[in-house]
């Protein structure tokens, strides 16, 4: 059985979609009778398959979303047929996907549909996604929240299976010693204590500005020495976020790192006093699990998939309520009993999310689809 995996739309492993694909490939265990093969941008020749016995087929397409969409619309069928795939997995269907399929197809959905449709072609893209999802054979939703969102858009619920993403427990685990005064994460030396939030500055729904305001309120109320570290690439909303940080009375205590390598988040989390995650558009919420796995308390939004993912291992707030966010920041620092409970529950919660299970369950779905 030959399974193709489409790496287009995964941002060269510099976003959540790219992290998904990189983690999937890294944790794939070769099995008899199954061959995986990736295809995508020539820029990704070594991005996902380095060190793995998995072939990568470069496709000569310009490195732009519109060019990749055109290729999927006009050329994907011929490519899939030429390479003899029995099935194809599409990890970024919200961004690039054929509108019809002549080979068995599985899409993996890691976000609610509407959050990816804020460009000039939103209406066309929404119709195209619906048409493609109607034609696809199987849909894997990374949370029940995503599954419910798909069903609300009229997608056949019988096509949908929920398979949770994993976290890399070889990377995210409690450190032995966090007693240093600084988190030494090259090229940064971040003074402790601090709160952290890892998210691209991509839009108002990520609630960076609300967090900055809440942090300012926390500082004013408690006079504690904490800093706020926001780690994520600049995006469409970066000017507004930088302006809010600059105008805060505690601007000198707010640090925006820009792009932050995924592997560096483990130390960023473990050396922090807590992960504060106010985003209201998370379909998966892996960052809160990664933070839990490093042994730090988590406070997050009470919306989207975060309550489903966190369970009883976090405290929740309304992301539009600045005082609630600030109060949660204070509680996980001042209330030792709460802090210790969140850490213990979080460590246990994180154990139930692993990539080995994600990969095995996904491949099983493809095998059943191909074999009938």
Positions of the model-derived regions?
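Carbohydrate transferase catalytic cores enriched for Leloir-type hexosyltransferases
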Residues: 1-372
């Amino acid at each position: 059985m030959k399974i193709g995996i489409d790496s287009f739309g995964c941002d060269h492993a510099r976003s959540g979609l790219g992290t998904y694909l990189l983690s999937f490939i890294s944790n794939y265990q070769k099995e008899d009778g199954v061959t995986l093969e990736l295809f995508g941008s020539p820029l990704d020749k070594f991005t996902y398959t380095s060190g793995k016995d998995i072939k990568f087929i470069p496709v000569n397409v310009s490195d732009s979303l519109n060019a990749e969409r055109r290729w999927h619309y006009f050329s994907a069928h011929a490519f899939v047929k030429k390479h003899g795939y029995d099935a194809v997995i599409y990890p970024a269907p919200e961004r690039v996907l054929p509108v019809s399929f002549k080979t068995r197809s599985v899409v993996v959905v890691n976000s609610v549909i509407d959050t990816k449709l804020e460009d000039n072609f939103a209406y066309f893209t929404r119709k195209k996604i619906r048409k493609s999802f109607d034609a696809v054979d199987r849909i894997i939703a990374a949370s029940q929240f995503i599954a419910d969102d798909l069903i609300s858009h009229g997608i056949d619920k019988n096509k949908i299976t929920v398979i949770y993403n994993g976290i890399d427990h070889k990377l995210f685990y409690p450190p032995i010693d966090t007693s240093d005064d600084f988190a030494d994460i090259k090229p940064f030396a971040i003074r402790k204590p601090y709160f952290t939030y890892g998210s691209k500055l991509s839009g108002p729904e990520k609630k960076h500005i609300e967090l900055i305001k809440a942090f300012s309120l926390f500082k004013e109320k408690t006079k504690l020495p904490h800093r706020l570290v926001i780690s994520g690439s600049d995006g469409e909303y970066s000017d507004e976020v930088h302006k809010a940080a600059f105008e805060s009375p505690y601007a000198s205590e707010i640090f925006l790192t820009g792009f932050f390598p995924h592997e560096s988040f483990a130390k960023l989390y473990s050396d922090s006093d807590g992960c504060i995650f106010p985003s209201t558009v998370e379909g998966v919420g892996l960052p809160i699990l990664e933070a839990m796995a490093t042994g730090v308390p988590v406070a997050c939004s009470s919306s989207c998939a975060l309550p489903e993912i966190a369970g009883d291992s976090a405290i929740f707030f309304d992301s539009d309520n600045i005082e609630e966010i600030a109060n949660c920041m204070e509680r996980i620092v001042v209330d030792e009993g709460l802090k210790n409970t969140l850490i213990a529950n979080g460590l246990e919660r994180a154990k139930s999310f692993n990539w080995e299970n994600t990969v095995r369950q996904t491949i099983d779905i493809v095998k059943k689809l191909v074999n009938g």
